[in-house]
Amino acid sequence: YHSYKVLNTSEQEDVVSTQYVDMDGDILRYSPDGVSVVDNSMNTIWNETYTMQNPIADVNGSRAVVADSEGTSLYICDKKGVTGTVTTSYAIVKVRIASNGMVAVILDNDDNTWINFYNPDGSLVAENLTKIDDPGYPMDVAVSDNGVMMVTFQYVDGSKTTSYVAFYNYGDVGQNEDDRIVSGYTYENVVIPQVECISDSKYIALRDDGFSTYQGSQIPKESKTVLSLIHISEPTRHLRIS
């Protein structure tokens, strides 16, 4: 680009601690003091004040969640305002929101971790206690609009690092399964730090040696694994369904 045109300007006193994220054409603005949504002309659509030490956010379409990392408060919102608030019992590690407003949260109290699932109004759908040895420490979480939550766990067995990808179903399909886990895959000598929900029936796990994809709206199954060029052999995988 050789030139640009300024469309709008807005004064911001605390530019260091304020973050901006696109929110379906508008802008989500959040800081330790509060959250707001502004339009392209920088007109405030709504705002909410709070006190957080280290706010983090996740946006999916017209829905967003803002949480206090290592704190206990989170705000669920859409383009019209806050739809729900939650005060957790343990420290917040990570939050993810689906485009319908369902929220998944990883919590940690040093001894154990929890993965909680919330409605857009902040009411609790489910809470899952996880342990370091089984199924491991939750590294990341993704959530779809149809009530399926994807989690990647990591645990160490002797000198071997193992990752476990689990799919939880909070609809009718998962109600008779232990911990609502409808499918799961174990990957030996592999680290999976990130998972994503691409659609209601497509998921991806980003591995340190490539990536794996999964398909299925209710019971996702592994469909493909692509390894990077430096890994010529695929790790041993075992299907694990609780």
Please describe what each predicted stretch is:
Residues H2-E11, N43-T49, G81-T87, L124-K131, ...:
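A short beta-strand motif characteristic of beta-propeller blades
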Residues N40-S41, D78-K80, N119-G122, G171, ...:
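Short loop/turn segments that connect beta-strands within beta-propeller blades
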Residues P32, S69-G71, N100, D110-N112, ...:
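Surface-exposed loop/turn positions within WD40 beta-propeller blades
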Residues T51-F153:
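Non-cytosolic head/periplasmic domains of membrane-anchored proteins
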Residues K5-D33, T49-A57:
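Beta-strand-rich domains and repeat architectures in extracellular enzymes and scaffolds
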Residues T72-Y75, N112-N116, G158-Y168, G210-Q215:
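Structural motif
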Residues I230-I241:
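Single conserved hydrophobic/aromatic residue that forms the stacking wall/gate
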Residues N109, I132-D134, Y155-T162, G174, ...:
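Repeat-based scaffolding regions
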